[in-house]
From Swiss-Prot:
<feature type="topological domain" description="Extracellular">
    <location>
        <begin position="703"/>
        <end position="707"/>
    </location>
</feature>
<feature type="modified residue" description="Phosphoserine">
    <location>
        <position position="111"/>
    </location>
</feature>
<feature type="topological domain" description="Extracellular">
    <location>
        <begin position="179"/>
        <end position="202"/>
    </location>
</feature>
<feature type="topological domain" description="Cytoplasmic">
    <location>
        <begin position="66"/>
        <end position="145"/>
    </location>
</feature>
<feature type="lipid moiety-binding region" description="S-palmitoyl cysteine">
    <location>
        <position position="398"/>
    </location>
</feature>
<feature type="topological domain" description="Cytoplasmic">
    <location>
        <begin position="600"/>
        <end position="619"/>
    </location>
</feature>
<feature type="topological domain" description="Cytoplasmic">
    <location>
        <begin position="503"/>
        <end position="506"/>
    </location>
</feature>
<feature type="lipid moiety-binding region" description="S-palmitoyl cysteine">
    <location>
        <position position="729"/>
    </location>
</feature>
<feature type="topological domain" description="Cytoplasmic">
    <location>
        <begin position="228"/>
        <end position="427"/>
    </location>
</feature>
<dbReference type="GO" id="GO:0005886">
    <property type="term" value="C:plasma membrane"/>
</dbReference>
<dbReference type="InterPro" id="IPR045122">
    <property type="entry name" value="Csc1-like"/>
</dbReference>
<feature type="transmembrane region" description="Helical; Name=TM8">
    <location>
        <begin position="642"/>
        <end position="666"/>
    </location>
</feature>
<dbReference type="Pfam" id="PF14703">
    <property type="entry name" value="PHM7_cyt"/>
</dbReference>
<keyword id="KW-0106">Calcium</keyword>
<feature type="short sequence motif" description="Mediates endoplasmic reticulum retention">
    <location>
        <begin position="86"/>
        <end position="88"/>
    </location>
</feature>
<dbReference type="GO" id="GO:0140338">
    <property type="term" value="F:sphingomyelin transfer activity"/>
</dbReference>
<dbReference type="GO" id="GO:0006887">
    <property type="term" value="P:exocytosis"/>
</dbReference>
């Protein structure tokens, strides 16, 4: 089908003498492609750079004035980690009976303590600029986790790749394009820099095809080099734990242990944790602690000032300046005391019901990786036999009651990677929810794919008529590319919330879904449809299913290679480099949510709670997708319009610096699996493949499908696609793959480890490394005699990190100067 289509396109293309009028009319009226001086690039570059400087100045001001945005939550989190580490070190020290030297442990404690987000090296007006360069990768690893280091390493390899591509494109391909004489001999013509300046029979076109294949090889080599240095660490606990779905809902942990130990004689089950529906329990626990913090806050305030505080308990109550019926003020301590008591009762009732809400899932931890792999292979082999010779897993006396024939067994994700509150959403409900959300998302993006649909709608009301004939680069290039950037910046936020409401079980799954959906929509929005002169997906489908498809297709594909078409994408990359990265520093979506939550707070105590809990994890999925969209645009046009590559390199350099700052200062660490990073590598490889597609279409339009350059490009493209499909679907051609990971195992919870010369203790395992929801771990030490469901009861008591925060006085959270700034801010809030 593809060769027939290309051959038809080549035949009809030769008969279409001048498709420019059609392509221009398909654009934003007649104001986007008009043969401006060098495509309007100098004007757009100057405007975007001035906007960039203005946004940096605004960020520096906001950083000094609203310094608590994105910082108090990080300080609170660092302080919580520091207290948790200190308690763990003390428990280990006592339990080990003074065995060995504790230097290494206290060195880790110092590392955590030193990662407070506000330090003395960036407390000036613009000193944060130099602080970005002084942050080391080891500091980022300690504070932000290994995923942040992998992400930044990925960016550095992309930068290196763009440096090589830029040298080849600007140093060789650009002079070759200049050597043509097909277009007018004008020094200010942007078209002279493009491949459209070469005649169809020029032998220099072989150079472009060869360079496209070379870029593909360079991309694969760069990604293999990145993945070979990635050294992805997998915790030993994760490799020894299986996640079982489809288990009998009322199966007990002892019965699960008995099954595996009977079925596998050499197997020792260390722990079996059934899963329960804890979504409402987690909600009540969070609300209870908020109320307790509010009561503690106003109790401390009254002890200082000896004056009771009155509050309006309605949302936005602190903004209401008039007392009307239904919005009367109440005494703060009394209100929060009643609210806390009510929530405590609801919490206890819900906790008693948790045992009655099993999910039919369990996490089972074994004594070593070998037996874990054997059990996993046993279940998966049986499942893969189909209806012909389906076998049963190894039986035991408990097989029938546990329904082992219905089990789905896989490796468990990291405990920090799990959304415990989402485990209860599954089966038909989850799929229906996912379908509805994605249908709504598709309908929304169906009509708002590009800014062209907005401007063409404005044209119907003659809004742009007065400026249509000005032929000004500000009108024709700056605003369309700015609009395109605004929509492409809004799309990741929309896609992220769609993935969030899908209720994925793991953070990695949520990020992967966001990355793939966002990348697909962005490529359609930013690259494919604007390149083809299509203003939205509705026109795309009308064109695709029209009876005159083949006749119109040639004209559509000619739109890709108009002389000034590349200028639109050059200007888009410039806007992304300067305005996009500056807006990433400001974090406008997060700032808006922060302001809304502050406005909805009912008192100063709740505003303080908002400030302490408004920092979020870095969204690797959306970040990868947006970055790969710009990279794909750059690589796709790197040969047909080589002037775009230096601006793509500028974008990646600024993006790298901005992300280093945000990861270290503005976001909480995230724990993901390697699939999110491998998915980004696959998207990188897609970029040079699209470049080959572009060259194939150009050669087919100019010389026909049977021309030598067209046939060579087609063969290379087919071989590349076949290799990619065989590798992705069947695992072949591993040596030609862009993936070259090396896995390292971290011994976090082995059978007989020794830490610093001391024997291990139960206290050495942090709570986050247990396959049980945090709210159930807290329940183990509530003191009311109720243990967490599925717990063995032999674990030593340890206080909840969040409950510790409640019992600490406000002035004892940390001993840093930054915390004293927080206290003074809160006091100023109180007296306002």
């Amino acid at each position: 089908m593809l060769p027939f289509l290309l051959a038809t396109l080549g035949t009809t293309a030769l008969n279409n003498s001048n498709p420019k009028d059609y392509c221009y009319s398909a654009r934003i009226r007649s104001t986007v492609l008009q043969g401006l001086p060098f495509g309007g690039v100098p004007t757009v570059l100057a405007l975007d750079f001035m906007c960039f400087l203005a946004l940096l100045f605004l960020f520096s001001i906001l950083r000094k004035v609203a310094w608590d945005y994105g910082r108090l939550a990080l300080v609170t989190d660092a302080d919580r980690l520091r207290r948790q580490e200190r308690d763990r070190v003390e428990q280990e020290y006592v339990a080990s009976a003074m065995h060995g030297d504790s230097h290494d442990r206290y060195e880790r404690l110092t590392s955590v303590s030193s990662s407070v987000d506000f330090d003395q090296r960036d407390n000036g007006f613009c000193s944060w600029l130099t602080a970005i360069f002084r942050i080391k990768d080891d500091e980022i690893r300690d504070k932000c986790g290994g995923d942040a280091v992998h992400y930044l390493s990925f960016q550095r390899h992309i930068i290196g790749l763009l440096v090589v591509v830029g040298v080849l494109s600007v140093g060789i391909v650009l002079p070759v394009n200049f050597s043509g004489d097909l277009l007018e001999n004008n020094a200010y013509s942007f078209g002279r820099t493009t491949i459209a300046n070469l005649k169809s029979g020029n032998n220099l076109l072989w150079l472009h095809t060869s360079f496209a294949f070379l870029y593909l090889l360079l991309t694969v080599y760069s990604m293999r080099r990145h993945t070979s240095k990635m050294r992805y660490k997998e915790d030993d606990l994760v490799k020894r734990t299986l996640f079982i779905n489809g288990i009998s809902k009322y199966a007990e942990s002892e019965k699960i242990k008995k099954h595996f130990e009977e079925a596998y004689p050499n197997c020792t089950v260390l722990e079996a944790r059934p899963c329960y529906n804890v979504a409402r329990l987690m909600f009540l626990d969070a609300e209870r602690k908020k109320a307790e913090r509010g009561k503690l806050y106003f109790t401390n305030l009254q002890s200082k000032e000896n004056v009771p505080t009155m509050i309006n308990p309605k949302p936005c109550g602190h903004l209401c300046c008039c007392v009307v019926r239904g919005c009367e003020q109440v005494e703060a301590i009394e209100y929060y005391t009643k609210l806390e008591q009510k929530l405590k009762e609801d919490y206890k009732r819900e906790k008693e019901k948790v045992n009655e809400k099993p999910l039919g899932m369990a996490f089972v931890t074994f004594h070593n990786e070998t037996i874990t792999a054997i059990i996993l292979k046993d279940f998966n082999v049986c499942k893969c036999q189909g209806c012909t010779c389906r076998g049963e897993p190894r039986p035991s006396s408990c097989s029938e009651s546990l329904h082992i024939s219905n089990w789905t067994v896989s490796y468990a994700p990291d405990p920090q990677n799990i959304y415990w509150e989402h485990l209860s959403i599954r089966g038909f409900i989850w799929w229906l929810r996912c379908l509805v959300i994605n249908v709504v998302l598709f309908i929304l993006l169906f009509f708002l794919t590009t800014p062209a649909i907005i401007i063409t709608t404005m044209d119907k009301f003659n809004v742009t008529k007065p400026v249509e004939y000005l032929n000004n680069p500000i009108i024709t290039q700056f605003f369309p590319t700015l609009l395109l950037w605004c929509f492409s910046a809004l799309l990741p936020t929309i896609v992220y919330y769609s993935a969030f409401f899908e209720a994925h079980w793991t953070r990695s799954g949520e990020n992967r879904t966001t990355m793939h959906k966002c990348y697909t929509f962005l490529i359609f929005m930013v690259l494919l449809l604007p390149s083809l002169g299509l203003s939205s997906l509705d026109l795309f489908f009308r064109w695709l299913f029209d009876k005159k498809f083949l006749a119109e297709a040639a004209i559509r594909f000619e739109c890709v290679f108009l002389p000034d078409n590349g200028a639109f994408f050059v200007n888009y990359v410039i806007a992304s480099a300067f305005i996009g990265n500056a807006m990433d520093l400001l974090r406008i979506p997060g700032l808006l949510m922060y302001m809304i939550r502050l406005c909805l707070a009912r008192s100063a105590a709740e505003r303080r709670n908002v400030k302490r809990h408004q920092a979020y994890e870095f969204q690797f999925g959306a970040a990868y997708a947006w970055m790969m969209c710009v990279f794909t645009v750059v690589m796709t046009y790197s040969i047909t319009c080589p002037i775009i590559v230096p601006f793509g390199l500028m974008y990646m350099l600024l993006k790298h610096l901005v992300d280093r700052y945000n990861l270290y200062y503005a976001y909480l660490p995230a724990k993901l699996d390697k699939k999110i990073h491998s998915g980004a590598v696959n998207q990188v490889v897609a970029a040079p493949i699209l470049c080959l597609f572009w060259l194939l279409f150009f050669s087919t339009m100019r010389t026909g499908f049977l021309a030598p350059t067209s046939m060579f490009t087609f063969v290379v493209l087919v071989i590349t696609i076949v290799i990619c499909l065989c590798h992705v679907c069947f695992g072949h051609f591993k040596y030609l793959s862009a993936h070259n990971y090396k896995i390292e195992h971290t011994e976090t919870d082995t059978v007989d480890p020794r830490s610093n010369g001391r024997p291990p203790t139960a206290a050495a395992v942090p709570k986050s490394a247990k396959y049980i929801a945090q709210v159930l771990q807290d329940s183990e030490v509530d003191g009311d005699g109720d243990g967490a469901p599925g717990s063995s009861g032999d674990e030593p008591p340890s206080s909840s990190s969040q409950d510790e925060e409640l019992l600490m006085p406000p002035d004892a959270l940390t001993d840093t100067d930054f915390q004293s700034c927080e206290d003074s801010l809160i006091e100023n809030e109180i007296h306002q």
